[in-house]
Regions:
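C-terminal helical cap(s) of enzyme catalytic domains, especially alpha/beta-barrels
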Residues: 123, 257-279
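Alpha-helix-loop-beta-strand connector modules within alpha/beta enzyme cores
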Residues: 9, 56-84, 149-155, 208-218, ...
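Conserved, mostly hydrophobic/aromatic
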Residues: 30, 37, 48, 113, ...
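Catalytic alpha/beta core domains of metabolic enzymes, predominantly
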Residues: 112-251, 257
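Active-site mouth loops of central-metabolism enzymes
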Residues: 13-32, 85-95, 135-140, 220-229
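N-terminal small/glycine-rich loop or linker at the start of catalytic domains
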Residues: 1-22, 117-129
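Active-site beta->alpha loop and helix N-cap motifs at the rims of alpha/beta catalytic domains
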Residues: 59-140
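Glycine-rich, proline-tolerant flexible connector loops at the mouths of alpha/beta enzymes
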Residues: 43-66, 191-194, 253-256
Length: 310
């Protein structure tokens, strides 16, 4: 019998309040919306803070994530949470871009890391225009970077959320699995580009192409549409019927309406129930992923040294 479906909520990304008045940006708003949406059926939560994706140092703040996550973990100690990371650029090592991910995992917070196993150009281009010269939308991760992120995820006993922006990314994951070095709990996130120009468009044929690569890996997988609506376009329904899971949220959404995260989660829940399934609980999501058990942690004190709060 088909099992429960994981709903991942991507709370905010780079979406601003000017673009959608409902998007949570402060740590307290992030915590509140995450908790409310978890009650509605979300079992994985992903958020950004206000650091830009392209920075001079590549560093993101640990303290900002702790401020947002602590209320969630107080209510749900086994919650599955993961941050973003700064985009790669020449001269900025992965150790800097991934430092906050590593520190959160070291503390046992969230239970997940993220691994983006390759490089990709991502840009918002419309009307058939050519991307402008000097565009900074190149997201770079070398083979060495990927090795670092997978190896540290395994050492930290954290489940990697693996972002697939191009089909070749799946082949890199397959190499790690074949070598027996893919960390436990890995989940494949298939990202399709609607308004954002990268990878494959959100069509049934594109999903089939991905599944030809993904299904032999026998890993849990989900679908997301960047710059679109994964439910409205029909991709979520096809994915669920094929055994996949779904990601929704204001990081990804683009459409004619101005929904809240709550409305997007409810939309996913309705679809799942119409298909005779149910949303996964946190415990069920952990079981589906095969994620390592949640490690105990204490409340994080308000003060800490520079390394811990960077």
């Amino acid at each position: 019998m088909p099992g429960p479906v994981i709903i991942e909520l991507a709370l905010n990304g780079s979406t601003t309040r000017d673009q959608n008045r409902h998007v949570p940006r402060s740590p307290s708003d992030i915590a509140d919306v995450a908790l409310e949406c978890m009650e509605l059926g979300a079992s994985i939560v992903h958020n950004h803070n206000d650091e830009p994706m392209f920075t001079e140092t590549g560093e993101h703040s640990v303290a900002s994530y702790i401020a947002a996550w602590q209320p969630i973990l107080d209510r749900h100690p086994d919650a599955l949470l993961y941050p973003t990371m700064a985009a790669g650029a020449r001269g900025i090592p992965v150790e800097s871009r991934w430092a906050h991910v590593e520190e959160l995992a070291r503390r046992g917070l969230g239970g997940m890391t993220l691994v983006d196993p390759g490089s990709v150009n991502i840009g918002l281009v419309s009307g058939g225009c050519v991307p402008p010269t000097g565009d900074q939308g190149c997201y770079q991760n070398t083979f060495d970077d990927v090795a670092y992120m997978f190896s540290r995820s395994a050492e930290l006993h954290a489940a990697p959320s693996i972002s697939i922006f191009e089909p070749g990314f799946v082949r890199i994951v397959a190499m790690w699995q074949k070598a027996g070095k893919l960390p436990p709990g890995a989940v494949i996130k298939l990202f399709f580009g609607a308004d954002l120009q990268f990878g494959l468009p959100p069509t049934p044929t594109a999903l089939e192409a991905y599944l030809e690569l993904v299904e032999p890996l026998q890993l849990p997988w989900s679908v997301a549409v960047l710059g679109g609506d994964v439910v409205e376009c029909g991709l979520a329904e096809i994915a669920i019927c094929r055994g996949g899971h779904v990601r929704v949220g204001l990081e990804d959404y683009a459409g004619g309406a101005e929904p809240s995260n709550h409305e997007l989660v409810r939309s996913a829940v309705r679809l799942i129930e119409q298909l005779g399934r149910k949303p996964a609980t946190i415990a069920e999501a952990r079981q589906i992923l095969g994620a390592p058990s949640a490690r105990p942690f204490g409340r994080i004190a308000g003060s800490c040294n520079v390394f811990e709060c960077r």
